[in-house]
């Protein structure tokens, strides 16, 4: 089963708490262009559904960023959650070589 997720570029100067209240999760994509990173947002429900079938640092995911015309394979590098509420706070993706 191939996993894929569509991300949007995160607007600048927007508080991550405000994004979470709107049902979006802040995310970051590393490794797609050397040391450069991109700040992204992902739909909360889509992220939760995807994370049910993902193993961190192992499962390849097709990441699509339509705004930047970028598409590639990545793995979930890190998942940040609230310690006892288990609310999703942040995702980090690491892009592999094409």
Curated annotation (Swiss-Prot):
Query: Which Gene3D superfamilies does the protein's record reference?
Result: Ribosomal Protein L25, Chain P
Record's Gene Ontology CC terms? ribonucleoprotein complex; ribosome
Indicate yes or no for the key word Manganese. Answer: no
**Biological-process GO terms, alphabetical:** translation
Q: Which HAMAP family match?
A: Ribosomal_bL25
Could you tell me which NCBIfam families the record lists for this protein? PRK05943.1
The family annotation for this protein states: Belongs to the bacterial ribosomal protein bL25 family.
Q: What does the protein in this record do?
A: This is one of the proteins that binds to the 5S RNA in the ribosome where it forms part of the central protuberance.
In Swiss-Prot or TrEMBL terms, this protein is called Large ribosomal subunit protein bL25
Taxonomic classification, please?
A: Bacteria, Bacillati, Cyanobacteriota, Cyanophyceae, Synechococcales
């Amino acid at each position: 089963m191939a996993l894929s997720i569509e991300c949007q570029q995160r607007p600048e100067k927007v508080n991550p708490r405000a994004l979470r209240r709107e049902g979006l999760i802040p995310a970051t994509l590393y490794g797609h262009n050397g040391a450069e990173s991109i700040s992204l947002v992902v739909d909360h429900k889509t992220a939760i559904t995807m994370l049910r079938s993902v193993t961190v640092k192992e499962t390849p995911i097709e990441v699509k960023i339509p705004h930047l015309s970028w598409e590639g394979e990545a793995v979930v590098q890190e998942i940040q959650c609230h310690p006892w509420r288990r609310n999703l706070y942040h995702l980090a993706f690491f892009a592999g070589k094409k």
